Amino acid sequence: MQRLHLHLLSDSTGETLEMIAKAALAQFDGADVVRHFWPMVRSMQHLDRIMGEIAANPGLVLYTLVNAETRERLEQRCAALGLPSVAALDAVTDALQQQLGIQAKGRPGRQHMMDEAYFARVDAIQFTIAHDDGVGWENWEEADIVLAGVSRSSKTPTSIYLANRGYKVANIPIVVESPPPSMLFSLRRPLVVGLTTSPERLIAVRRNRLLSLNQAPETAYVDNEQVTREVQFARRMFADNGWPVIDVSRRSIEETAAAVINLYNERTAAGASGDGVKPI
């Protein structure tokens, strides 16, 4: 069966769009689909960057965009590439039938499926809360994703956001003086992703954190030399282990989570195609 790259574009969080795509794809047993998630598309410049990614992995484009100019630009660019673009609330199932080359089958029990999805999300949230900040490392193999990064690199909020999407996530702080559990380097099932940021951005975030706690704003925690050392140490660890890295310096939590989801989907697709699990 031919692989389909499915691009999901939204000018908001994209949660509704993702649910629509999941519901439609449930009609196609065994379909080889790689989902690419692009939320918060609110400028022409952002759209143009995404179109470069779409051109590299051509496929079906589903979108929920309110701005008429952005919609028109997307449709024009897709047409120029010879790619179908579909508003998500239109005939999603019909477009998937054409691209996948198989007939959608009527499937009863949709509400039951939604109930299962709801409980799976609750389970993911419970798992993620119980495995925050390096806690419960003995169970990391049960996770879908493990996020690693220095303190204040947005590991926890990104983990919670992903959990609300149904992913079981653990996260671990990378500390120079305290190496992480050895299990981190031998995980097979979870996707391990390194989160990094610039020392300048990290110092600003940490200083704000100290001020919010009414603590002295000038400590080793925000010392430029120390912070730079931490960031470099973490980056070397990521590189040595072949883990994909996301720079969160200029990303919102939603954008960081979307990047993680794309990495996860690509890794899952690589495994399903028989290529095995590879660093991304």
Swiss-Prot record:
GO terms for molecular function: ADP binding; ATP binding; phosphotransferase activity, phosphate group as acceptor; protein serine/threonine kinase activity. It catalyses: N(tele)-phospho-L-histidyl/L-threonyl-[pyruvate, phosphate dikinase] + ADP = N(tele)-phospho-L-histidyl/O-phospho-L-threonyl-[pyruvate, phosphate dikinase] + AMP + H(+); N(tele)-phospho-L-histidyl/O-phospho-L-threonyl-[pyruvate, phosphate dikinase] + phosphate + H(+) = N(tele)-phospho-L-histidyl/L-threonyl-[pyruvate, phosphate dikinase] + diphosphate. It is an enzyme of class 2 (transferase). Pfam families: Kinase-PPPase (PF03618). Its EC number is 2.7.11.32, 2.7.4.27. ADP binds at G149, V150, S151, R152, S153, S154, K155, T156. It comes from the Bacteria. Keywords: Kinase, Nucleotide-binding, Serine/threonine-protein kinase, Transferase. Bifunctional serine/threonine kinase and phosphorylase involved in the regulation of the pyruvate, phosphate dikinase (PPDK) by catalyzing its phosphorylation/dephosphorylation. Belongs to the pyruvate, phosphate/water dikinase regulatory protein family. PDRP subfamily. This is Putative pyruvate, phosphate dikinase regulatory protein. It comes from Novosphingobium aromaticivorans (strain ATCC 700278 / DSM 12444 / CCUG 56034 / CIP 105152 / NBRC 16084 / F199).
